[in-house]
């Protein structure tokens, strides 16, 4: 049976959105994360290493669901509208704040990069409003007062520069291997800032990460690139903490580097 071009394109679009949503939800919700293979690149060689990588993020909670029962057709119609908005080239801050959405049993579940009551209302005003929309995750800000170490058994982490302009959206960090053996690192990270009350909280950053490992020989350095979203949450002057967590010699280690925005 030959499929008409329009039908084939619709099927491809649906599969693409499903896969992208699974990636985003897996990154932002531990309960939806799955075991993945971490691929190491050594020169031109590729080595597949089985490794569970679960990204720490927001706990999954549910808002009060509507008493109304929605049909699959109704939910699917909302999904199509959200897909068209999400794939639009004109990404507004409200759209950039959306990291994924999917169809539940009686709802459309939406994950936001910065999940506050105000941002939820912004979504309903600017993107789509329906009682079927339910927002995933704990409300921000999420407190994270952890501290890490800058060096552990020869593995060190630091920002490429000690300070950056206030409007910065991309920051690079250097991870260096002086452990005496090969070291493999990934791309997942988190960033915290200090609030007015003295507590540190998680700021909106990337929410999905490629499950790939980069291998450093002894003496080599690599780069981890982080992003900030000042159009979603304005950057404020001050010190920020960048975290990279890895298993080193069987120990769960939280590496930390600081940088300043001014």
Q: Which stretches of residues belong to each language-model region?
A:
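Sec-dependent N-terminal signal peptides of Gram-positive bacterial secreted proteins and lipoproteins
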Residues: 2-26
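N-terminal, intrinsically disordered, polar/charged segments of Gram-positive cell-envelope systems
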Residues: 24-63, 145-159
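Short glycine/threonine-rich beta-strand-turn micro-motifs
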Residues: 40-43, 49-51, 58-75, 92-126
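Short proline/glycine- and acidic-rich turn/helix-capping motifs at secondary-structure junctions
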Residues: 62-79, 134-147
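A mature extracytoplasmic/lumenal domain signature
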Residues: 69, 112-116, 179, 187-189, ...
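Primarily secretory-pathway and cell-envelope proteins
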Residues: 142-210, 215-216, 245-262
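Intrinsically disordered, low-complexity Pro/Gly/Ser/Thr-rich segments with frequent PxxP/GP/PP motifs
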Residues: 206-232
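A short tyrosine-centered beta-strand micro-motif
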Residues: 235-245
């Amino acid at each position: 049976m030959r499929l008409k071009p329009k039908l084939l394109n619709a099927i491809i679009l649906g599969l693409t959105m499903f896969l992208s949503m699974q990636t985003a939800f897996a990154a932002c919700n531990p309960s939806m994360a799955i075991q993945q293979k971490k691929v190491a690149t050594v020169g031109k060689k590729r080595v597949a290493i089985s490794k569970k990588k679960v990204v720490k993020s927001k706990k999954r909670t549910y808002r009060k669901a509507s008493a109304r029962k929605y049909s699959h057709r109704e939910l699917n119609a909302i999904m199509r509208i959200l897909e068209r908005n999400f794939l639009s080239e004109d990404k507004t801050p409200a759209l950039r704040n959306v990291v994924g959405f999917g169809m539940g049993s009686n709802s459309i579940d939406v994950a936001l990069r910065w999940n506050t009551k105000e941002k939820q209302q912004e979504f309903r005003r600017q993107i789509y409003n329906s009682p079927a929309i339910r927002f995933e995750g704990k409300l921000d800000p999420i407190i994270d007062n952890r501290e890490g170490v800058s060096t552990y058994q020869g593995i060190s982490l630091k920002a490429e520069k000690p300070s950056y302009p206030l409007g910065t959206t991309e920051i690079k960090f250097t991870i260096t291997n002086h452990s005496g053996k090969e070291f493999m690192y990934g791309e997942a990270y988190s960033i915290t800032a200090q609030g007015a009350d003295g507590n540190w909280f998680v700021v909106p950053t990337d929410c999905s990460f490629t499950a790939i490992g980069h291998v450093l020989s002894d003496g080599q350095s690599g780069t981890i690139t982080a992003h900030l979203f000042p159009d979603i949450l304005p950057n404020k002057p001050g010190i920020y903490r960048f975290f990279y967590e890895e298993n080193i010699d069987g120990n769960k280690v939280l590496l930390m580097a600081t940088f300043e925005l001014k």
